[in-house]
A protein has these predicted regions:
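Transmembrane beta-barrel wall of Gram-negative outer-membrane proteins
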Residues: 79-82, 92-182, 187-196, 200-218, ...
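Outer-membrane beta-barrel signature, preferentially recognizing the C-terminal barrel domain
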Residues: 150, 206-208, 326-335, 381, ...
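C-terminal beta-signal and adjacent terminal beta-strands/loops
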Residues: 537, 587-601, 627-685
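Gram-negative outer-membrane beta-barrel transporters
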Residues: 452, 457-463, 467-599
Length: 685
């Protein structure tokens, strides 16, 4: 949201905080170092709708809600259901994808409901590589999407015990298996084991689950509405490696395992909430005062289990070494919070709301945040809204404690845990919470019966932003890795390290525009028009400096923050409905983005200070979907995402690693997979 990191968005399910993923993004770009919520673990068949609050909300919800809040509402019907299936592939002929889902509602007793959902997804890999300079052939499978198998379940249930008490519960469970190809390794590397060369594959076997139990009701102590709940969520990926080798062991013995257990990760979150609300009639206010307050207790845990010994021995498994005992461990913290929210109408046109929240973290202390919001209705057609809020985001436990080393044929790059001896050797300091101030001003217009407009201007200032920075190369990097108990494979010519740091102060400002309009065509049906536009710019206000006096962010990392996302995005959609037919057409324009790319050839090859500036030109994407109601219950569909097979600009030769890496994966506005064509069917009952 609003050009910020996934870490700056709070995700709720049915109004309850969702746990974060145990996977940390280490691939570079704006998302580098992020550990946000994985929405893919919530089955699509279970979702009724998604609510988006594009405003700072830390004063109501606590950490993470700097850019806004996403609230996923699960289906709660007590009867009927839906069965859906779709099948498609990319225009290049690969990436066969199948999705299937079923949802149904049951009623029990006089007031109880149970809504059940199941979903599966099967996705074949894609390959978008150019010519490998080492072999002269196309098809290095490391450039493409991985193969994926996912199964997911969900339920949502509730029952009223009497007029004032309702019990409720909901849960999700997802199992996901992924196999991701890495860079092809030449036959000369291990001719006995792999006479034709080999392609290592990172595997992930992941279980993600969440359970909420709660009770809510009214008339507590005569007047209070109340909600008492407990939510436990966990993400547990097991990471392995197939078709690989430990080169050091192979050199010593002539043999090596080909598969390795690299690590097991776990991120858990246990949240307990008490929320209370009531209205007070006060003589000096023209309308009741809505008084809400609540308490929250949260326990967070992050765990890293070491891989098998050969996965990290003397350089470890090729492509990605396993976690060694020195980088494994378990870390946890406790969070206590309390909030107060007051709202009222000062007259029939003017609404006012104020909120404050206090939170105490066992690992870094306390924070207090506030919000003031107002809405004024000038007429039935024109309203204005404004808000001012402070916010914060605590560093995730993974950001503080995760270590990894990625290895390609000529490069090794390590992310060091910020509180590790290795990072301390380079001058790392403890992470502090990010702090923010948000300003929002908007207009809501209904100038015509079928026309709705909303325009919102915003400004978000973030201090001590947590970024992936502080890059070191050469001998300092090698010394730091060794100090952290990480061995480096022999024969590598370029070694670098980096760590998470409070490295930047930023200012983001922009404009959101949404519009909807209904065109009535009489006997020819209707067209629902939707327009969405965003203009957004992030400025680096301050580049923090390390102990050595050098800036923590180089030009490449600065570009990730300020230029890796489009500064404007406009989407126009028309949805035509005519008798049994429906046609949806959507056109989206993304403005250019800018990257500072690594050089892989020439005098600046592998430099961490000099980069190759590259512009991804503006892109226009066309999506189309056709549907037909074959019967009262059965709907057939066909469509294309990216109908005209638009792909990102290709990289210049000097920044295309070994020739096969064709695209800028850090700042491309669109996927490199191109057009996707599909057929589908849905049956309601």
């Amino acid at each position: 949201l609003r050009g910020l990191s996934p870490n700056h968005v709070l995700v709720l399910v049915n109004g309850k905080r969702r746990h974060e993923t145990a996977n940390i993004n280490v691939s570079g770009g704006l998302q580098s170092g992020s550990t946000g919520v994985d929405l893919d673990t919530i089955p699509l068949a279970a979702i009724e709708r998604i609510e988006v609050l594009r405003d700072g909300a830390s004063a109501q919800y606590g950490s993470d809600a700097i850019a806004g809040v996403i609230n996923v509402i699960l289906k709660s019907a007590d009867h009927g259901g839906r069965l859906a299936y779709d099948n498609g592939r990319y225009g290049d002929g690969d990436g066969l994808t199948q999705n299937g889902g079923v949802n149904g509602g049951l009623r029990f007793g006089e007031s109880g409901f149970l809504n059940l959902s199941a979903q599966f997804r099967e996705q074949a890999r894609t390959i978008r590589a150019g010519i490998d300079q080492r072999t002269g052939h196309y098809g290095n499978p490391s450039i493409g999407d991985p193969s994926l198998h996912r199964q997911a379940l969900a339920y949502n249930a509730g029952v009223a015990l009497d007029d004032n008490v309702e019990l409720y519960s909901f849960a999700t469970y997802t199992h996901r298996s992924v196999s991701s190809a890495q860079i092809y390794q030449l036959p000369s590397l291990a001719p006995r084991l792999y006479p034709n060369g080999f392609t290592p594959r990172i595997t992930s076997d992941e279980d993600d689950y969440s359970l909420t139990l709660g009770a809510r009701g009214g008339e507590l102590f005569g007047a209070w509405d109340w909600d008492l709940s407990s939510t436990y969520g966990a993400d547990r990926p097991e990471i392995g490696m197939d078709h690989s080798i430990n080169l050091a062991l192979y050199g010593e013995t002539g043999d090596s395992p080909r598969s390795f257990d690299l690590a097991r990760y776990k991120a858990t979150q246990w949240t307990n909430n008490l929320d209370l609300r009531r209205d007070f009639d006060l003589a000096w206010l023209p309308a009741p005062l809505n008084f809400s307050w609540g308490l929250e207790q949260r326990r967070e845990l992050y765990e890293v289990e070491a891989g098998d010994p050969w996965s990290y021995y003397n350089g470890g498994s090729k492509a990605l070494p396993g976690q060694a005992p020195a980088t494994a461990g378990q870390w946890s913290r406790d969070v206590l919070g309390a909030y107060l929210d007051l709202s009222t109408a000062l007259d029939e046109r003017w609404q006012l709301e104020t909120a404050a929240r206090y939170e105490h973290y066992s690992d870094f202390g306390s924070t207090t945040n506030g919000k003031l919001a107002s809405r004024y209705r000038f007429s039935p057609e024109v309203s204005a809204r404004a808000s001012l809020s402070s916010g914060f985001r605590a560093p995730s436990l993974a950001q503080e404690n995760y270590t990894s080393l990625g290895v390609s044929p000529t490069i090794a790059s390590g992310l060091l845990a910020v509180n590790s001896p290795a990072a301390r050797l380079l001058g790392a300091e403890d992470l502090e919470p990010e702090k923010s101030i948000s300003y929002n001003l908007g207009l809501v217009l209904d100038p015509l019966p079928d026309l709705n407009l909303a325009i919102d201007a915003y400004r978000i200032e973030i201090r001590d932003r947590i970024v992936d920075g502080a890059t070191y190369s050469g001998q300092p990097a090698i010394d730091a890795l060794r100090a952290g108990g990480i061995s480096i494979p022999a024969g590598l010519t370029q070694v670098s390290t980096h760590y998470m740091t409070n490295g930047a102060d930023t200012r983001t400002h922009g404009l959101d525009l949404t519009a909807s309009y209904l065109t009535r065509l009489g006997e020819w049906g209707r067209i629902d028009w939707r327009l969405g536009a965003n203009v957004n710019r992030t400025k680096l206000v301050r580049n923090h400096r390390g102990r050595n006096g050098q800036p923590l962010l180089n030009d490449q990392q600065q570009a990730w923050i300020t230029r890796s996302t489009p500064r404007s995005q406009v989407s126009l959609q028309a949805d035509w409905s005519y008798r049994r037919w429906g046609l949806t057409l959507r056109e989206t324009r993304y403005s250019k983005t800018v990257s500072e790319l690594d050089y892989y050839t020439g005098e600046h090859a592998y430099s961490t200070t000099v980069f190759n500036r590259f512009e991804n030109s503006p892109k226009y994407i066309t999506d189309v979907a056709l549907r037909y109601a074959a019967s009262r219950n059965l709907t057939l569909s066909a469509g294309a995402n990216n109908l005209f097979d638009v792909k990102p600009d290709k990289l210049p030769a000097e920044s295309a690693y070994l020739g096969f890496n064709q695209y800028d994966t850090y700042a491309s506005q669109i996927s490199f997979n191109g057009a996707f064509y599909y057929l589908g069917a849905a049956y309601t009952f």
